[in-house]
Amino acid sequence: MKSLTHLSSYRALSTHFSIIKDLHMRVLFKEDENRGFRYFLQSGDLKLDYSKNRISDETLKLLFDLANECSLKNKIKAMFEGQKINNTENRAVLHTALRNKTNRSVKIDDMDIMPNVREVLAKMQKFSDSLRTGSWLGYTNQIITDVVNIGIGGSDLGALMVCKALKNYAHPRLHMHFVSNVDGTQLQDVLERVHPASTLFIVASKTFSTQETLTNAFTARKWFLKHALDEKHIAKHFVAVSTNKEAVKDFGIEPENMFEFWNWVGGRYSLWSAIGLAIMIYLGKENFSSLLEGAYLMDEHFYNEPFEKNMPVIMALIGIWYINFFDAGSHIIAPYDSVLRYFPKFIQQLDMESNGKQIRKNGKKVDYDTGPIIWGDTGINAQHAFFQLLHQGTHLSPIDLIASLNKKGNLPDHHEILLSNVFAQAEAFMRGKTLEEVQEEMAKKGLKEDQIQKLAPHRVFSGNRPSNILLLDEIHPRSIGSLVALYEHKIFVQGVIWDINSFDQWGVELGKELAKTILSELKGGKTQEHDSSTNHLIQIYKNFNSN
């Protein structure tokens, strides 16, 4: 494949950009009164309004041409068919198989993986049922009231985000806790709130060798044994999500309480697998099934719909437009419901670990920008924090505004206030406010001319700031499944366009390797040859703790 910037469709986009780059969205809406209806898509429980973007019909046509020149349709097919598209690790990428709701087989090297997928899912269902019904008892015959998931990265964030988002569907007796940081404080805070006789620990580590996870797991094990006294009781209070049976058994966990997943499931794409055990325990097997169903529906939409009606494809291509032509270095996720407060952080990992790459699949360095910085917060909080920069700052940062349509609980007025802010912010980003409009407004309020001249420039909004609005019918397991799968596929499409491998994460490894050496030095070993800064920092630590 040619470098992106040498493709004829990319060059056509460059020419088009020089024509359209300063065109204001006000003009686009004025020229097309149906723009808001035409630039609108629905798939299942999700609705996407992408009309408030700096695009025209010609822009979209050229972006679709780019997707075709990059053989996107064939690349989508290759992923779903189990081809080894993770070329640096020679692995298939089949998180989609985990939510396959059909009877069709999914093969890797001519072997159908669906029987194994269904077997692990059934095992998860049986175990979660035993906890939820109270038939699984702790070492003192108490029922389990607290579940602590110990993991990091993909073994933590996905399950954490879903459990927080869907807490209204949780079992009333169960309390779910997540521990990822190795600082000790997070684990200590959890252990102070739970009782050993009624707590279950899930240790989530594919290799059962992740330093941070095992440090926390062994600390939890030590805390538990301080009360339970006998190692045989570990079997009732610790389970593992892993592939390393021997290490799991050595820890004291019974092999039948180990839940398997596979190397064709990337960590950040793994909440649909046994890594989602915490989700199933907390929400129940029916709601977990609805989560999978929502993702499956988005998979079907992504695979079958033409690009012109394909939600992940359109979101991805619009993102390419901003990153590679407008030089937008970041993208913002702003959910307007507090239960989705972990969603920006989850997408941050999903996107930045997938597409934070500078080497093409052929081993050559890119000569264009790739993955953006992803950041965000819940919408109303964000309005009173960083929206100032979005409205009047010097950076162009596209934003996804996410909200649900369903009036919740006994406070419908709150929800209407919330949605009014969503729609108003998107309109304000698009329209802005001109100097003339500001001056006229100030004059109507009776301000003097000298005050108007002095203050008016500070109240001008340039507008033309892009946004997508994503509306969920309601926050439900199915809609959350679709929402996550939407972003998974968007990220995949962008990786295809940039010709990078979205499914490895070598950038995680270097710091971990260096940390092993430095850890031995901090513990008193001989300091190796580092740079002067690192040597100095190690010595500062040793001196501080020498007394």
Swiss-Prot record:
One example of a Gene Ontology biological process annotation: glucose 6-phosphate metabolic process
UniProt keywords, alphabetically: Cytoplasm, Gluconeogenesis, Glycolysis, Isomerase
Name of the top EC class for this enzyme: isomerase
Subcellular location: Cytoplasm
PROSITE patterns reported in the protein's UniProt record: P_GLUCOSE_ISOMERASE_1, P_GLUCOSE_ISOMERASE_2, P_GLUCOSE_ISOMERASE_3
Pathway: Carbohydrate biosynthesis; gluconeogenesis; Carbohydrate degradation; glycolysis; D-glyceraldehyde 3-phosphate and glycerone phosphate from D-glucose: step 2/4
GO cellular component: cytosol
EC number: 5.3.1.9
GO molecular function, one term: carbohydrate derivative binding
Catalytic residues (positions): E353, H384, K512
Role according to the record: Catalyzes the reversible isomerization of glucose-6-phosphate to fructose-6-phosphate.
Protein name per its UniProtKB record: Glucose-6-phosphate isomerase
Lineage summary: Bacteria, Pseudomonadati, Campylobacterota, Epsilonproteobacteria, Campylobacterales
Gene designation: pgi
